[in-house]
């Protein structure tokens, strides 16, 4: 079984943790932006399935 030779320093651990948190923040920001784009109805990059019942009512 692979075992690390030395203990990782707190600085290195914090650096890795901050990178992980930054990536998560960027992903959350992109998801929020995408959600806002979909809700406005002006997004051109999506194809929405249209229910036949909705077309009949209109």
Curated annotation (Swiss-Prot):
GO cellular component: large ribosomal subunit
Any GO MF annotation of the entry: structural constituent of ribosome
UniProt key word Ribonucleoprotein: yes
Disulfide cysteine pairs (residue numbers): none
Membrane-spanning intervals of the chain: none
GO BP, sorted A to Z: translation
The entry's keywords: Ribonucleoprotein, Ribosomal protein
Pfam family, any one: Ribosomal_L32p
UniProt entry tagged with the keyword Ribosomal protein: yes
Assigned protein family: Belongs to the bacterial ribosomal protein bL32 family.
HAMAP family cross-referenced by the UniProt entry: Ribosomal_bL32
The protein's name in its UniProt record: Large ribosomal subunit protein bL32
Species for this entry: Prochlorococcus marinus (strain MIT 9211)
Lineage: Bacteria, Bacillati, Cyanobacteriota, Cyanophyceae, Synechococcales
